[in-house]
Design a protein with these regions (language model features):
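Short, flexible, glycine/charge-rich loop motifs used to bind or transfer phosphoryl groups or to couple energy/partner
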Residues: 2, 124, 141
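Preference for short coil/turn "hinge" residues that link or interrupt alpha-helices
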Residues: 65, 121, 136-138
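Extended mid-to-C-terminal alpha-helical interaction segments
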Residues: 89, 121-125, 130
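Juxtamembrane/interface motifs at transmembrane-helix termini
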Residues: 120, 150-151
Length: 166
């Protein structure tokens, strides 16, 4: 696809549908009750908007572009996993290209980004009848697709995920 610009490596969470029945305010303490799985994922991204300045906190956490696909890696049962300061990287051995990152680039840590999204869902009174994913933002940034092949993303202590770009 000629509009595909790059890929991002992210932490994603599977949230239980019980979250929508929760009538109290979501917080860091009760947030963990609604997370069933955690996984590394690759987001294949396309067109990006150019934002001029930041007008709100949401601008820092919002993705202003067209996402083409999410590839979710192996899910791990969530057991209060610490993803605050984990090294990450995306590599393509075919073209000898590696980009290094860290999970702390996302709103200090991915759990903060998750909390922000869930608070917004609660505030807007969104309802849904099944479990759902929340993708918490890039730990590596948009890595340009410089060639075809398999791009492998690794988040230390969490796992790896691969996407074939052809």
């Amino acid at each position: 696809n000629k509009f595909t610009m790059g890929i991002e490596l992210e932490v994603c969470y599977m949230i239980k549908k019980d979250f929508f029945k929760f009538n109290k305010k979501i917080s860091k303490k009760n947030l963990k009750n609604f997370i069933s799985y955690i996984a590394p994922c690759i987001e294949v991204v396309g067109y990006r908007q150019r934002k001029k300045g930041i007008k709100s906190l949401g601008d820092l956490c919002s993705d202003f572009g067209a996402n083409i696909k999410f590839v979710v890696g192996p899910k791990k049962k969530y057991k209060n996993n610490n993803v605050k300061n984990l090294k990450t990287y995306i590599t393509n051995k075919k073209i000898n290209h590696t980009v290094i990152g860290n999970t702390n680039t996302v709103y200090i840590n991915p759990l903060n980004a998750l909390l922000f999204v869930l608070k917004k869902i609660q505030k807007d009174k969104i309802n849904h009848n099944s479990d759902f994913y929340v993708f918490t933002g890039s730990s590596v940034g948009v890595v340009p697709i410089l060639g075809k092949g398999i791009y492998k993303g690794v988040i230390n202590k969490l796992g790896s995920v691969s996407a074939k770009i052809s």
